[in-house]
Regions:
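C-terminal cap/substrate-recognition subdomain and adjoining C-terminal extension
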Residues: 51-55, 156-233
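Short, acidic loop-to-helix structural element flanking the phosphoryl-transfer center
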Residues: 119-145, 153-157
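Solvent-exposed, polar/charged alpha-helical surfaces in well-ordered, non-transmembrane soluble domains
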Residues: 83, 87, 129-136, 157-161, ...
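Sec-exported extracytoplasmic/periplasmic mature domains
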Residues: 90, 94, 136-143, 153, ...
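Second-shell loop/turn segments in exported
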Residues: 66-78, 117-125, 146-152, 180-183
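Asp-based phosphoryl-transfer active-site loop
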Residues: 102-117, 147
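Non-catalytic pre-domain segments flanking phosphatase-related domains
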Residues: 2-106
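Surface-exposed patches in mature extracellular/periplasmic domains of secreted proteins
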Residues: 93-103, 145-151, 173-175, 204-207
Length: 233
């Protein structure tokens, strides 16, 4: 099934607005939820599969469950892709010359957060542990972490809170303001990466789950996570 860029944009905006409405009643209770589930540590040490199939074969909820996307399969595919990309990123970080300002750029929904695998009232939305671990590793070594999302500006503060609450370092967050809504998502995201470069940063990797997150250049390498033909936002 192919989903147009306009449909994807509308779905992202609608989901964001729904989340904003739900959070107004849920924010007082978020403190107890802020710590992410401790899944990352056993993953690296466990047997071959990075995620237990018995524990994760079905999604907790959300659009992914409605569409029949298997949660455990998705987690394993994401883990395999990030694990394959990480050595080159680590080497690039280690080779950064003095004075360089390296940066990672990430999409948010189903790239940094498990957005489509939880109902919109789940707040904060859990992090994707492998991606979070990569950003924490990079940030600890002087790499700036930028998020470029098609989410509307009305939920910028809620989005930033969510990212920080689940453990992401945030050097900058780009959301779609009113003028940006007239651009295709790919054009908007490309322009924001160009802005980051104009600030003196070198984008060593751009991570996303949709082609619209990755096309347009302005990054040394791209890392493509699964979107199952556009089923995931």
């Amino acid at each position: 099934m192919r989903i147009s860029r306009r449909t994807r944009t509308s779905r992202t905006a609608a989901a964001g607005l729904a989340a904003a409405a739900a959070v107004l009643t849920l924010v007082p209770a978020t403190a107890a939820q802020a710590a992410p589930a401790a899944a990352a540590a056993p993953v690296a040490a466990a047997a071959p599969a990075p995620v237990s199939a018995a524990a994760s074969t079905s999604a907790p909820g959300g659009n992914a469950a409605i569409l029949g996307i298997d949660y455990g399969t998705w987690q394993r595919e994401v883990a395999a892709i990030v694990d394959a990309a990480r050595p080159a990123i680590e080497q690039r970080i280690a080779a950064s010359p003095a004075g360089e300002k390296p940066a990672l750029v990430l999409d948010i929904d189903n790239t940094s957060l498990e957005t489509d695998f939880h109902w919109f009232w789940t707040y904060p939305t859990p992090a994707i542990s492998k991606v979070r671990a990569l950003t924490q590793y990079a940030h600890a070594r002087g790499v700036a972490i930028f998020f470029v999302t098609a989410r509307p500006g009305i939920i910028e503060s809620l989005t930033e809170y969510n990212l920080k609450a689940v453990g992401y370092p945030v050097s900058g967050l780009y959301v779609r303001s009113l003028p940006d809504l007239f651009d295709e998502v790919s054009e908007y995201k490309t322009s924001k990466r160009a802005e980051i470069e104009a600030r003196g940063y070198t984008i060593i990797a751009n991570i996303g789950n949709s082609p619209t997150d990755l096309v347009g250049g302005h990054a040394e390498r791209t890392v493509k996570l699964p979107d199952y033909g556009g089923k995931l936002s």
